[in-house]
Every structure is written in C-alpha cells, then in structure tokens.
C-alpha cells in the first residue's frame, strides 16, 4: 500500500513539473513585447514602404534604393503599432523621380552597386491614418 501511495505522489510531482515547464513557455512572451511578424503582413508592408520612401527622400544619392530582403521584422502593440525592421537595401538603376521602385533593377556594376543593412522603427496608428519613422540607422 505504501509503495502504491509513493508511486502516486511521484507521478503527481512529475506531472506538476512538466506542467510548470510547459506553462513557462507561454509566460515568457510579455504583453506588449515585440513579437515576430510575417513578412507578408499588410501592416508590415505599409511600414516598410513608408520607411523606404523616407530613406530615399533623406538620401543624397541620385538613385533610389529598395529592399533586397527582410532580415527580421517585429511588431509591438503600444498606443499604436510599432514595427521594428531590419532589412538589406540596395541601390537601383532608377533615379529618385521614379514612381514604382519594385520594377527597378539593382545596379550590377561593382562601382555602382551599393548594399546596406538598415534598421527602421516605424510607428503606425492605422485607425487615425498616421505613420511616422521613429528611427533609421544604416551601416
């Protein structure tokens, strides 16, 4: 009888330990903390387009740049939505006056090709139709 009771206590302790370990995974993500966002997310795409328009507007380059690839993208719910983006951008063959950058090819001549990694932080309040570039750092 004592052996059976010991097994039940041991089994209950093991189940509690497994529950605590599995439950801690859900608790590690804090409310309001940045979370990964899918690259195809509509809000992310708007934020990225806005960040690139601001980057090109501030750039002294004769040519426009556009995103080569998204390295990482996170979304944080604050009093709006903050997008934290790390992207690789490249110089295109299109002058700044061009409208549609997606159809612009990247320079392939070594002296003209320029690739840079940038971090953009974009703050969006979609229900007020407001968007602002909070941070733009490129290396």
Swiss-Prot record:
Compartment(s): Secreted
Family annotation (CDD domains): CY
Alphabetized UniProt keyword annotations: Disulfide bond, Phosphoprotein, Protease inhibitor, Secreted, Signal, Thiol protease inhibitor
InterPro entries, alphabetized: Cystatin_dom, Cystatin_sf, Prot_inh_cystat_CS
GO terms for MF: cysteine-type endopeptidase inhibitor activity
Signal peptide: 1-23
Motif (Secondary area of contact): 76-80
Main subcellular location: secreted
Disulfide bonds: 94-104, 118-138
GO cellular component, one term: extracellular space
Coiled coil, from the record: none
Phosphoserine: residues bearing it: 103
Site (Reactive site): residue numbering on this chain: 32
Classification via Pfam families: Cystatin
Functional note: This protein binds tightly to and inhibits a variety of thiol proteases including ficin, papain, and cathepsins B, C, H, and L. Although isolated from egg white, it is also present in serum.
UniProt family annotation: Belongs to the cystatin family.
Name of the protein: Cystatin
Organism expressing this protein natively: Gallus gallus
Phylogenetic classification of the source organism: Eukaryota, Metazoa, Chordata, Craniata, Vertebrata
């Amino acid at each position: 009888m004592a052996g059976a009771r010991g097994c039940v206590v041991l089994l209950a302790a093991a189940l509690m330990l497994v529950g605590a370990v599995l439950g801690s995974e859900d608790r590690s993500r804090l409310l309001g903390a940045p979370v990964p966002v899918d690259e195809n997310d509509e809000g992310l795409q708007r934020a990225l387009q806005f960040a690139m328009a601001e980057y090109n507007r501030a750039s002294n380059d004769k040519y426009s740049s556009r995103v080569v690839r998204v390295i990482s993208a996170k979304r944080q719910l604050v009093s709006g939505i903050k997008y934290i983006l790390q992207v690789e951008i490249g110089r295109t063959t299109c002058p700044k006056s061009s409208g549609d950058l997606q159809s612009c090819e990247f320079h392939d001549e070594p002296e003209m090709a320029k690739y840079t990694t940038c971090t953009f932080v974009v703050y969006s309040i979609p229900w007020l139709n407001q968007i602002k570039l909070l941070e733009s750092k490129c290396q």
